[in-house]
Each structure stands twice: as structure tokens, then as C-alpha cells.
From Swiss-Prot:
Its cofactor is Mn(2+); Mg(2+). Belongs to the RNase HII family. The gene is rnhB. Endonuclease that specifically degrades the RNA of RNA-DNA hybrids. Its EC number is 3.1.26.4. It holds the Pfam family RNase_HII. One of its GO terms (biological process) is DNA replication, removal of RNA primer. It is found in: Cytoplasm. One of its GO terms (cellular component) is cytoplasm. Its main location: cytoplasm. The keyword Methyltransferase does not apply. GO terms for molecular function: manganese ion binding; RNA binding; RNA-DNA hybrid ribonuclease activity. This is Ribonuclease HII. Keywords: Cytoplasm, Endonuclease, Hydrolase, Manganese, Metal-binding, Nuclease.
Length: 212
């Protein structure tokens, strides 16, 4: 199933005029920030949805396909906002509050006001805008799928920058997710400033270091 505009069309029929899709990337990583994006699609997309046929849930696309989709979203979005919460704040707040903070920052950085939000499996307390929380929203709503692309590509680029600072961890390869390569690097070099020290196995490693 590919994302489409059926949910957006339902909201428009209820009288909402400007809709933003919101999604995040990096929630389950051992290292790096949580990045969220908010996307308002341009009116032409509602007239010609095929313009974004290349846009899908970011997890279903290759890196090359995501870059192509990213370019299309940039071209056919009325507004894009991005919010980034670094690893040390993920540790300080916890992953759920950090994710909501990133989403809120993305919403607040939009260049236009919105009437309703479509959010992938989440709600934003304190935001006085009608919200639709959609399970697997990035596979159902084109607005959320577009946000997932922006969030994922933005975060991947940040992790490529981190890789240039700390090449021994392989951030450019795994983007901070838990892989055997990442685990071996953690054991060999210990955590970097980009690592989330409250996440396993980073916490396990720190506990072992403290007890030795």
C-alpha cells in the first residue's frame, strides 16, 4: 500500500484548509539526534498527486530513492519545518519527550500556519491544533510520508557529518542504529559525544566501565 491523499481529502472536506504531516527519524538509534519534519504540501499536489509518486514511507526506499523523493518534496511543498534534538537532550528528557520536542520544533519552524496535523503514531500535548494520530501513518498519508523523507534524509546527512568527526564508529554506514559493526566499535572505542548514554548497549558499556 502506497501513501495517498485520502486522509487529507477527508480533513479538507471537514473544512480544514492547511494540513501538515509530521514524522521523525532516529528514535531507536544508539547515537545521534532525533530529527522530525513537518511538511505542508502545495495545492498543486492535491490537483496532481502523481507529482509525488516517488514518495513513500522512508523505510521502504533505498538511499538513492530517498534522495530523489527529498528533491521532489522540496519542490512541491508549500512549507517545510525541521526540528532536531541532540543525543544529550534525548538522555536528559527521555526518548518520548525528545521525540515530541523535535516534532514541536518542526511544526514551529514551518513558514506557514496550519489548521490540522497528521502525525505518525504520536500526539503533541500543548499544541492547540487539531491532530490526527495515525498508526503507520507514513504508509497511509502522503503528507506524513513526505515528512518522513525530509526527516530521514536530514538525519542521514547529519550522521555523515558525525562520521567525519568520529570515523571509527561507522556512522555514515549505519547512521547510529544498532548493528554488529556499531556494537564492535562501541566496545573498542567507548561512546562518543554523539552517543545516547541512556540507551542499550551504550549504558551496558558504561556500567561495565564503572564496575571495572
Amino acid at each position: 500500500m502506497s501513501p495517498d491523499l485520502s486522509i487529507e481529502q477527508t480533513l479538507l472536506a471537514r473544512g480544514y484548509r492547511v494540513l501538515a504531516g509530521i514524522d521523525e527519524a532516529g528514535r531507536g538509534c544508539w547515537a545521534g539526534p532525533v530529527v522530525a519534519a513537518a511538511v505542508v504540501l502545495a495545492p498543486i499536489v492535491y490537483e496532481r498527486p502523481g507529482l509525488l509518486d516517488a514518495v513513500d514511507d522512508s523505510k521502504q526506499l533505498t538511499a538513492v530513492a530517498r534522495e530523489r523523493a527529498y528533491t521532489l518534496v522540496q519542490r512541491y511543498a508549500r512549507g517545510i519545518g525541521v526540528g532536531t534534538v541532540p543525543a544529550f537532550l534525548v538522555d536528559a528528557y527521555g526518548i518520548l519527550p525528545a521525540t515530541r520536542l523535535a516534532m514541536t520544533l518542526a511544526l514551529l519552524s514551518l513558514p506557514c500556519s496550519v489548521d490540522a496535523l497528521l502525525i505518525d503514531a504520536e500526539r503533541l500535548p500543548g499544541i492547540r491544533v487539531p491532530q490526527e494520530s495515525l498508526v503507520r501513518g507514513d504508509a497511509r498519508s502522503l503528507s506524513i510520508a513526505a515528512a518522513s523523507i525530509i526527516a530521514k534524509v536530514t538525519r542521514d546527512r547529519l550522521m555523515q557529518t558525525a562520521d567525519r568527526c568520529y570515523p571509527q564508529y561507522g556512522f555514515a554506514l549505519h547512521k547510529g542504529y544498532g548493528t554488529p559493526v556499531h556494537r564492535r566499535a562501541l566496545r573498542q572505542y567507548g561512546p562518543s559525544p554523539f552517543h545516547r548514554r541512556t540507551f542499550q548497549p551504550v549504558l551496558e558499556l558504561l556500567d561495565l566501565t564503572d564496575s571495572s
